[in-house]
């Protein structure tokens, strides 16, 4: 073994296997592409994205960590969302007031 070397197992890693998913139709109504990262509280994403923000409360994109989805102007997408886990607290972005999602 080489110091720092990592040995990976075989096969694909399945993420969010037990998470309750919802599907959301999203359209970028702006004139520039918008990217949304894997752990962004989805209702707080760019205001140019048109979707049911109330239904998406407490959810994030169902994509691997450190990745993003790019929404091109005028293009409709259907995305899969999963609940934010852990403490379910969101600070920063546009949540007013910031803090726990379930309070």
Curated annotation (Swiss-Prot):
Task: Tell me the organism's taxonomic lineage.
Answer: Bacteria, Bacillati, Actinomycetota, Actinomycetes, Mycobacteriales
Which organism does this record belong to? Mycobacterium marinum (strain ATCC BAA-535 / M)
A GO molecular function term, named singly, is: urease activity
Q: Give the reaction(s) catalysed.
A: urea + 2 H2O + H(+) = hydrogencarbonate + 2 NH4(+)
- Give yes or no: UniProt keyword Hydrolase: yes
Q: Which HAMAP family match?
A: Urease_beta
Q: Name one Pfam family in it.
A: Urease_beta
Q: From which domain of life does this come?
A: Bacteria
Name it: Urease subunit beta
Description of how the protein assembles with itself and partners: Heterotrimer of UreA (gamma), UreB (beta) and UreC (alpha) subunits. Three heterotrimers associate to form the active enzyme.
């Amino acid at each position: 073994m080489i110091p720092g070397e990592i040995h990976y197992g075989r096969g694909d890693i399945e993420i969010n296997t037990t998470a309750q998913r919802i599907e959301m139709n999203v359209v970028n109504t702006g004139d520039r592409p918008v990217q949304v990262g894997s752990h962004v509280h989805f209702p707080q994403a760019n205001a140019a994205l048109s979707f049911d923000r109330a239904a998406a409360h407490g959810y994030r994109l169902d994509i691997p960590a450190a990745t993003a989805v790019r929404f091109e102007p005028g293009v409709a997408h259907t995305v899969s969302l999963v609940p934010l886990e852990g403490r379910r607290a969101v600070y920063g972005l546009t949540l007013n007031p910031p803090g726990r999602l379930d309070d």
